[in-house]
Amino acid sequence: MAVTVEEAPWLGWIVAKALMRFAFMVANNLVAIPSYICYVIILQPLRVLDSKRFWYIEGLMYKWLLGMVASWGWYAGYTVMEWGEDIKAIAKDEAVMLVNHQATGDVCTLMMCLQDKGPVVAQMMWLMDHIFKYTNFGIVSLIHGDFFIRQGRAYRDQQLLVLKKHLEHNYRSRDRKWIVLFPEGGFLRKRRETSQAFAKKNNLPFLTHVTLPRFGATNIILKALVARQENGSPAGGDARGLECKSRGLQWIIDTTIAYPKAEPIDIQTWILGYRKPTVTHVHYRIFPIGDVPLETEDLTSWLYQRFIEKEDLLSHFYKTGAFPPPQGQKEAVCREMTLSNMWIFLIQSFAFLSGYLWYHIIQYFYHCLF
């Protein structure tokens, strides 16, 4: 489609702004990620002497890095409106977030809306597709202890065993609290047809806005962090270094992300900011772990039911622009999530000052050695 004379200045501004944002993102990554790695390296003696304190400091830096990613969307006008139950109330408890997956922007949205939930981001473990391991943020996630999972039948059983070992060695020993999981196993646009064919074959509901979840990873997480806890031996790593024993996994947070007109934001849009300001809506429901069945067949049915309910939530949202009110209430209440501009300024300043500091330290040692 040809660009008119009237549209040319506007299009030029969009392109110029996208280029400036991209340049800033590159600079941000070049100072923040190497600085994070350098701090982690220099703090290794503390990891041996006081593991809990080491992972606390690492978690803070991890939260700041995710805050920087969140700020890219924030200053492009991509904000979040929260609905449903207040998850701040359980920020210090162990929980699993089950999230529907539409696009790469889902991860950025969660990075933003969880920033004001106390220690959650610092003590969080992500389960994400292995392709993210090869992004600029992959090394940070590897150090933090996030898990990269390969999709596909050929890898499924082997990956679940690796996940089980990963939880046993890294979850509680690093004082992790929340796990973020996308049970659909892929983006909506890629899995919808396969899911609908599976539903038709097995007499399950026909879903449009979500796909039927895969239960494998959820099953492994619950067995590792709930079942063994009941037998008196804390799962997820050696907890002897912790000041008090963990009470185990306590909550499932059913999280539903909805975009206006069902048009999701991808990571390119989040970085370049060429889309008009958009409000993403996130709905939370909290389920006590005692209400979640642990037997495979019952757990599968329970998960299916949650995603059938997600379908209803999203259908209502796309028709009305709002999520339905909870049972017994006439109107749903939403909360605008905000980021502090001062906090963003401080973490960005720390990142660039750290980058400057480490550059000169490395340069000094390089000249001393060579």
From Swiss-Prot:
Q: What happens when the gene is disrupted?
A: Mice are born at the expected Mendelian frequency. They show reduced body fat and increased mortality during early adulthood with an average life span of about 5 months. Mutant mice produce poorly nutritional milk and are unable to nourish their litters leading in high pre-weaning mortality.
* Topology with respect to the bilayer: Multi-pass membrane protein
Q: Report the residue ranges where the short sequence motif HXXXXD motif is annotated in this entry.
A: 101-106
The entry's keywords: Acyltransferase, Endoplasmic reticulum, Lipid biosynthesis, Lipid metabolism, Membrane, Phospholipid biosynthesis, Phospholipid metabolism, Transferase, Transmembrane, Transmembrane helix
Which superkingdom does the taxonomy of this entry point to? Eukaryota
Question: According to the UniProt entry, what is the EC number of this protein?
Answer: 2.3.1.62, 2.3.1.22, 2.3.1.-
Residues spanning the membrane: 22-42, 342-362
Reaction(s) catalysed (UniProt annotation): a 2-acyl-sn-glycero-3-phosphoethanolamine + octadecanoyl-CoA = 1-octadecanoyl-2-acyl-sn-glycero-3-phosphoethanolamine + CoA; 2-(9Z-octadecenoyl)-sn-glycero-3-phosphoethanolamine + octadecanoyl-CoA = 1-octadecanoyl-2-(9Z-octadecenoyl)-sn-glycero-3-phosphoethanolamine + CoA; a 2-acyl-sn-glycero-3-phosphoethanolamine + hexadecanoyl-CoA = 1-hexadecanoyl-2-acyl-sn-glycero-3-phosphoethanolamine + CoA; 2-(9Z-octadecenoyl)-sn-glycero-3-phosphoethanolamine + hexadecanoyl-CoA = 1-hexadecanoyl-2-(9Z-octadecenoyl)-sn-glycero-3-phosphoethanolamine + CoA
SMART domains the record matches = PlsC (SM00563)
Main localization of the protein? endoplasmic reticulum
Localization recorded for this chain is: Endoplasmic reticulum membrane
Tissue-specificity statement:
Ubiquitous. Expressed in heart, kidney, liver, skin, intestine, and thymus. Highest expression is detected in brain and testis.
Q: What does this protein do?
A: Lysophospholipid acyltransferase involved in fatty acyl chain remodeling of glycerophospholipids in the endoplasmic reticulum membrane. Selectively catalyzes the transfer and esterification of saturated long-chain fatty acids from acyl-CoA to the sn-1 position of 1-lyso-2-acyl phosphatidylethanolamines (1-lyso-PE, LPE), with a preference for stearoyl CoA over palmitoyl CoA as acyl donor. Acts in concert with an unknown phospholipase A1 to convert palmitate PE species into stearate ones.
- What family, per the record? Belongs to the 1-acyl-sn-glycerol-3-phosphate acyltransferase family.
Q: What is the official name of this protein in its record?
A: Acyl-CoA:lysophosphatidylglycerol acyltransferase 1
Organism per entry: Mus musculus (Mouse)
Q: Which gene encodes it?
A: Lpgat1
